[in-house]
């Protein structure tokens, strides 16, 4: 899996190329989390968002499909005793319905062949009235609306999923 291979260098590359965006994403997500929330982060990668939200959460369950990314996340998140790092598939989450106050899925939806499957699972595990946060980087010179069909899978998925 590509993510297992890039995991050891992921933070170095991202922090070199996009340090401000990377930090701003974590800060923005943290503002949307209520103090004391129980949060599921899907596709946590190396744990940057989980690290940003952990100080205000009662519990964070940081998940990723890639064991390589999880290895990096475990190192980064070891200082937070209330953060659990687990392997999980965003399209087939093994958590009970209504388990979390908030679910975060950063920078992943656009990478999935069937984003609707992930969105349905996210909706299923967030409690009624909970928060769903799906931040995605936008590169100003390469906007999806410049390529009309670029976001079709996501647009098709939204009405049925949420």
Annotate each language-model stretch with its function.
Residues 1-35, 48-52, 69-72, 76, 131-161, ...:
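Conserved class I S-adenosyl-L-methionine
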Residues 91-103:
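A short acidic, Gly/Pro-enriched loop at the edge of an enzyme's catalytic core
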Residues 116-128:
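A short glycine-rich, Lys/Arg-flanked "PGG" loop and its adjoining helix->strand segment in the class I
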């Amino acid at each position: 899996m590509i993510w297992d291979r890039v995991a050891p260098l992921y933070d170095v590359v991202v922090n070199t190329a996009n340090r401000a965006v990377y930090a701003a994403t974590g800060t923005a997500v943290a503002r949307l989390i209520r103090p004391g929330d129980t949060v599921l982060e899907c596709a946590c990668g190396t744990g940057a968002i989980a690290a940003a939200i952990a100080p205000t959460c009662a519990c964070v369950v940081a998940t990723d499909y890639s064991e390589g990314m999880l290895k990096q996340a475990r190192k980064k998140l070891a200082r937070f005793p209330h953060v659990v790092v687990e392997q999980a598939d965003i399209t087939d989450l093994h958590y009970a319905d209504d388990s979390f106050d908030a679910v975060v899925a950063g920078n992943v939806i656009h990478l999935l062949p069937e984003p609707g499957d992930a969105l349905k699972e996210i909706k299923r595990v967030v409690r009624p009235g909970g928060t769903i946060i799906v931040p995605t980087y936008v590169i100003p010179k390469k906007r999806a609306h410049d390529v009309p069909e670029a976001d079709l899978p996501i647009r098709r998925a939204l009405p049925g999923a949420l």
